[in-house]
Amino acid sequence: MADNAKSLTVSIVTPDGQVYENKTPMLIVRTIDGELGILPNHIPVIASLAIDEVRIKQLESDQEDDEIAVNGGFVEFSNNTATIVADSAERQNDIDVARAENARKRAETRIQNAQQKHDDAELARAQVALRRAMNRLNVARH
């Protein structure tokens, strides 16, 4: 059993339900202002998350880190509990690489079409879709 002073609890939830919950010695997230590492007893924080991977260190050093593709949302940390509320999130082993690759190709096509039509709103949506697809692919391939 992990010593509470040496670990924190991480919970990741989406509109579809809980994706992840575990204890960790360190959580690493990318906020809109840059990377943030959270250790036990960190000061309370709330931050908006970028579309990127969340890395959760394992209590046992010989185990691989858990990696989760998170597509926006926020992290709130207090009392040694980190709660990530994400628009969507997928654990590394749950990512369908073929589906993510198809999403990447569709997004690239949408970007080209939006640029040709000078449709700024569609271009912005397509760029977000591309970032989400690339995030899923990057996490799946680690």
Swiss-Prot record:
<comment type="similarity">
    <text>Belongs to the ATPase epsilon chain family.</text>
</comment>
<dbReference type="InterPro" id="IPR020547">
    <property type="entry name" value="ATP_synth_F1_esu_C"/>
</dbReference>
<dbReference type="GO" id="GO:0046933">
    <property type="term" value="F:proton-transporting ATP synthase activity, rotational mechanism"/>
</dbReference>
<dbReference type="InterPro" id="IPR001469">
    <property type="entry name" value="ATP_synth_F1_dsu/esu"/>
</dbReference>
<protein>
    <recommendedName>
        <fullName>ATP synthase epsilon chain</fullName>
    </recommendedName>
</protein>
<dbReference type="InterPro" id="IPR020546">
    <property type="entry name" value="ATP_synth_F1_dsu/esu_N"/>
</dbReference>
<dbReference type="InterPro" id="IPR036771">
    <property type="entry name" value="ATPsynth_dsu/esu_N"/>
</dbReference>
<comment type="subunit">
    <text>F-type ATPases have 2 components, CF(1) - the catalytic core - and CF(0) - the membrane proton channel. CF(1) has five subunits: alpha(3), beta(3), gamma(1), delta(1), epsilon(1). CF(0) has three main subunits: a, b and c.</text>
</comment>
<keyword id="KW-0472">Membrane</keyword>
<keyword id="KW-0406">Ion transport</keyword>
<dbReference type="Pfam" id="PF02823">
    <property type="entry name" value="ATP-synt_DE_N"/>
</dbReference>
<keyword id="KW-1003">Cell membrane</keyword>
<keyword id="KW-0139">CF(1)</keyword>
<dbReference type="GO" id="GO:0045259">
    <property type="term" value="C:proton-transporting ATP synthase complex"/>
</dbReference>
<keyword id="KW-0375">Hydrogen ion transport</keyword>
<comment type="function">
    <text>Produces ATP from ADP in the presence of a proton gradient across the membrane.</text>
</comment>
<dbReference type="GO" id="GO:0005524">
    <property type="term" value="F:ATP binding"/>
</dbReference>
<dbReference type="GO" id="GO:0005886">
    <property type="term" value="C:plasma membrane"/>
</dbReference>
<dbReference type="Pfam" id="PF00401">
    <property type="entry name" value="ATP-synt_DE"/>
</dbReference>
<dbReference type="InterPro" id="IPR036794">
    <property type="entry name" value="ATP_F1_dsu/esu_C_sf"/>
</dbReference>
<keyword id="KW-0066">ATP synthesis</keyword>
<keyword id="KW-0813">Transport</keyword>
